[in-house]
Structure formats: C-alpha cells, structure tokens
C-alpha cells in the first residue's frame, strides 16, 4: 500500500521543519489518538540527526476497552533521520505486534510554498503474511489484509491531525510572543 499525503501549514519552512523535529512531544495534546510520545534517543552524525520515538496510541480508546487490548497493539516505535540541509526526514515505523511482518517506511519533504510550507509524505506499508507467526496458515493472508487496512486507515488521518496540531501550536506560540 502506497502512502501519499500532503499538508499545508501557513508558516515558514524553517519554523515548521524545526517544530516537527524538535517539538514532537509537545504536539500530543493536538493528536486525539496519541496518549504520549517519548524520545528514546537522539544522535547527530555526519550532518544528520537520528531520532527514535516511542508512540503510545489509544488515547481515544476507553480505559475499559484498553484493559482488554494488548498495549502492543496501540504502540509503535518511529526511527527518523532528519537532513536539515535538504529539509527532509526519512522514517521507519516498527509496530510492536507482527514486527517482522510489517514494513512501513517513507520520507517527508518540507517545501516552501507561497508564504507557508507544503509537507509531502511519501512511503509504503507492506504486510508480509509469511512473517505472521502463531496463526494457522489459512488465516495469515486475512490477518495481513486486516492489519494493512487498519494501519493504512490510521496513517493519513494521524498525519493530517499532526499537521493541524503543528499549525495550532505555532499559532499559540505566535500569540504568546505578541
């Protein structure tokens, strides 16, 4: 499944890029499906910034329902490489369930657009049914389709909500500064 999402934010590219890169944990209040984002590591090397974040989903899942769901179904790890000179980030998402079966990777381009920033997110989500362990062979293809459809339906709205969150965050910061 190909991922192709665009978002426009009416702020300058350097500010938008830095907000996505440096303020991710502060954007949680703007994302209804995320409970927490935790920075696990940050390393600069050869002009690139390598970040690892753990995402904790399920914010809109009632606590009672969460008690019956595995936390692994709601959480994931994102590894990203930020290239400041090109205003890009390459990302790789590792699910905590069916980790070997799920391949989700892509790249975001932050482009100057009029007086704002156009973010183009391109990637792919692939589920390999042969890597789904512990289920009867007949079910693995169906499980792969369900997982791919579920994740595929979550990625675009989460990206759009995060972009809207960046916009709200920057407007709030602008109001405080004025």
Where in this protein do the model-derived segments appear?
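Hydrophobic ligand-binding cavity/cleft-lining segments
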Residues: 1-64
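A conserved amphipathic terminal alpha-helix motif
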Residues: 136-178
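Helix-adjacent hinge/juxtasegments
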Residues: 61-84
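A short, hydrophobic/aromatic-rich structural module that often spans a beta strand
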Residues: 1-7, 13, 97-112, 169-178
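Short, exposed beta-strand/loop patches in secreted or surface proteins that constitute
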Residues: 39-43, 82, 110
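Structured beta-strand/loop patches that form or line metal/cofactor-binding pockets in enzymes
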Residues: 88-90
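Beta-strand/loop substructures that line and gate deep hydrophobic ligand-binding cavities in soluble
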Residues: 51, 76, 81, 92-149
């Amino acid at each position: 499944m190909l991922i192709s999402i665009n978002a426009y934010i009416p702020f300058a590219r350097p500010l938008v890029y830095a907000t996505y890169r440096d303020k991710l944990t502060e954007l949680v209040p703007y994302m209804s499906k995320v409970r927490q984002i935790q920075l696990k590591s940050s390393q600069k090397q050869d002009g690139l910034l390598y970040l690892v974040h753990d995402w904790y989903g399920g914010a809109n899942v009632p606590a009672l329902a969460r008690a019956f769901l595995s936390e692994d179904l709601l959480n994931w790890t994102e590894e990203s490489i930020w290239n400041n000179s090109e205003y890009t980030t390459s990302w790789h998402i590792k699910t905590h369930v069916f980790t070997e079966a799920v391949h989700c990777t892509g790249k975001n381009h932050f482009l100057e657009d009029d007086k704002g920033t156009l973010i183009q997110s391109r990637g792919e989500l692939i589920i390999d049914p042969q890597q789904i362990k512990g289920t009867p062979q007949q079910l693995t293809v169906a499980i792969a389709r369900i997982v791919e459809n579920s994740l595929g339906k979550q990625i675009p709205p989460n990206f759009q909500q995060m972009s809207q969150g960046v916009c709200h965050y920057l407007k709030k910061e602008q109001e405080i500064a004025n």
